[in-house]
Amino acid sequence: MVQKVEARGGEIGDVWDDGAYDGVRKVYVGQGEDGIAFVKFEYVNGSQEVVGDERGKKTLLGAEEFEVDPDDYIVYVEGYHEKVFGVTTKEIISTLTFKTYKGKTSPPFGIVSGTKFVLQGGKIVGFHGRSTDVLHSLGAYISSPATPKLRGKWIKVEQKGEGPGPRCSHDIAQVGNKIFSFGGELTPNQPIDKHLYVFDLETRTWSISPATGDVPNLSCLGVRMVSIGSSLYVFGGRDASRKYNGFYSFDTTKNEWKLLTPVEQGPTPRSFHSMTADENNVYVFGGVSATVRLKTLDAYNIVDHKWVQCSTPGGSCSVRGGAGLEVVQGKVWVVYGFNGCEVDDVHCYDPAQDKWTQVETFGEKPCARSVFASAVVGKHILVFGGEIAMDPKAHEGPGQLSGGTFALDTETLKWEKLDKLGEEEETPSIRGWSASTTGTIDGKKGLVMFGGKAQTNDRFGDLFFYGVDSA
């Protein structure tokens, strides 16, 4: 489906329309005295190349070129328009920047000045607008795939046995038909225990796992845990005096802990970081050290038993804690987080190229937040809840918390809100600082969420599952 998005900018000048094609291959932009004087686009239509007309008037400054790779396409145009006063007042486009799906970004053509506008929503396949001897406005044709909305449902999972009880700032991971929980607090900044709890999905019963080997020496909060195969991997977290844990594995078949990296030998000790894994690597991103917030990404290969520090994201990705971190189709995604305030940007790391890309998303975007629940189903990243404003007492207080279930399609870069009218009673209460993992319950894959901090500053001890019916 191709949608014509109205032109943004001024309302004077001759109307022009290039139409819609299969994609945009080249962009030419010429600057003038006051802003963008000239644009021209080359398109691809099947096996044919279509060259659009020159829009505006080329000046002695010439034109700059932005080329799109054959296996890529433009998904985002950022521009600015402003009024220029002279013999007559006219509104012109002062700046244009183009970004592709794979992260290739043009330089900003022109001088950033005026009112910002954005053209996005899918694959951009054509342009239209108004011009005289300058460019007054720009719109686009955008192709959006007719993909079905992700469908699912929240259920509250029955719990029996000796469980973790109410807590937040802990983590969970699933191995087979068991969910494991480790760390956390009931009272702010006071870790509860260092038991490893195990929930049997067949009997819906909690118990404390027997533990041998190098049992972690600290009860901790702000800890992170992931699973690969039959093993759990636990990194970081702190106690009340801000001592930190190292990096451990737990063999769920032997109930045996192993210290893989002492705290002084691995990545910077931290808490409230983010962790995820693929088949061979554990990834650790960001978090809060004893002195500063971080934005480094470290990878531990479980075959080589070695840590590698990946490239550090550029300036567009700020230091942060409480971000979502997920692996989707081989790439590592950083979603939102807290850098002194809540942020709503998304970044993607490609391990094969050791390269970061800031991703521009659209749709029913959740507002800026951190310490939310997250999971991956297919190409979608699911999120629920989180903190949307820090408490004046920092971690001692609840902050302003949120609810809402959202999905980010990592191919179209579109957010959708999944909550349905009439099903509010089945949706978990608003919360943040909960533990979450991608899990499978009763044959469905989805988001498993346990505990968290309530708006009253109490702690939850409930277990919820958002099972996906279709994607």
Curated annotation (Swiss-Prot):
Positions of the Jacalin-type lectin domain: 2-144
Kelch repeats: 178-226, 231-277, 281-330, 332-379, 381-435, 446-471
Catalytic residues as annotated in Swiss-Prot or TrEMBL: R238, R293
Domain of life, per lineage: Eukaryota
A GO BP entry: nitrile biosynthetic process
Cofactors that this protein relies on: Fe(2+)
The family this protein is said to belong to: Belongs to the jacalin lectin family.
Protein name: Thiohydroximate-O-sulfate sulfur/sulfate-lyase (nitrile-forming) NSP2
Tissues showing expression: Expressed only in seeds.
Pfam families hit by this protein: Jacalin, Kelch_KLHDC2_KLHL20_DRC7
One term under GO cellular component: endoplasmic reticulum
Note in the entry: The proton donor differs depending on substrates.
Gene ablation phenotype (knockout): No visible phenotype. Reduced simple nitrile levels in favor of isothiocyanates in tissues corresponding to its main basal expression. Abnormal accumulation of glucosinolate in seeds, during stratification and germination.
The protein's Enzyme Commission number: 4.8.1.5
PANTHER family: KELCH REPEAT PROTEIN (AFU_ORTHOLOGUE AFUA_5G12780), NITRILE-SPECIFIER PROTEIN 1-RELATED
Enzyme class, spelled out: lyase
Binding site for a (Z)-N-(sulfonatooxy)alkanimidothioate: R238, S271, R293, G322, V371, W433
Taxonomic placement: Eukaryota, Viridiplantae, Streptophyta, Embryophyta, Tracheophyta
InterPro entries reported for this sequence: Jacalin-like_lectin_dom (IPR001229), Jacalin-like_lectin_dom_plant (IPR033734), Jacalin-like_lectin_dom_sf (IPR036404), Kelch-typ_b-propeller (IPR015915), Kelch_1 (IPR006652), NSP1/2/3 (IPR035429)
GO-annotated molecular function: carbohydrate binding; lyase activity; metal ion binding
Notes on how activity is controlled: The presence of Fe(2+) supports lyase activity in a dose-dependent manner with both benzylglucosinolate and 2-propenylglucosinolate as substrates. More active at pH 7.4 than at pH 6.
Keywords: Iron, Kelch repeat, Lectin, Lyase, Metal-binding, Repeat
Residues involved in Fe(2+) binding: E387, D391, H395
Catalytic activity: a (Z)-N-(sulfonatooxy)alkanimidothioate = a nitrile + sulfur + sulfate; (Z)-phenyl-N-(sulfonatooxy)methanimidothioate = phenylacetonitrile + sulfur + sulfate; (Z)-N-(sulfonatooxy)prop-2-enimidothioate = but-3-enenitrile + sulfur + sulfate; (Z)-(indol-3-yl)-N-(sulfonatooxy)methanimidothioate = (indol-3-yl)acetonitrile + sulfur + sulfate
SUPFAM superfamilies the UniProt entry points to: Kelch motif, Mannose-binding lectins
Function of the molecule: Specifier protein responsible for constitutive and herbivore-induced simple nitrile formation, especially in seeds. Promotes simple nitriles, but not epithionitrile or thiocyanate formation. Converts allylglucosinolate (allyl-GSL), 2-propenylglucosinolate (sinigrin), indol-3-ylmethylglucosinolate (glucobrassicin), benzylisothiocyanate and benzylglucosinolate (glucotropaeolin) to their corresponding simple nitriles in the presence of myrosinase. Catalyzes mainly the conversion of benzylisothiocyanate when benzylglucosinolate is used as the initial substrate of myrosinase.
Record keyword Lipoprotein present: no
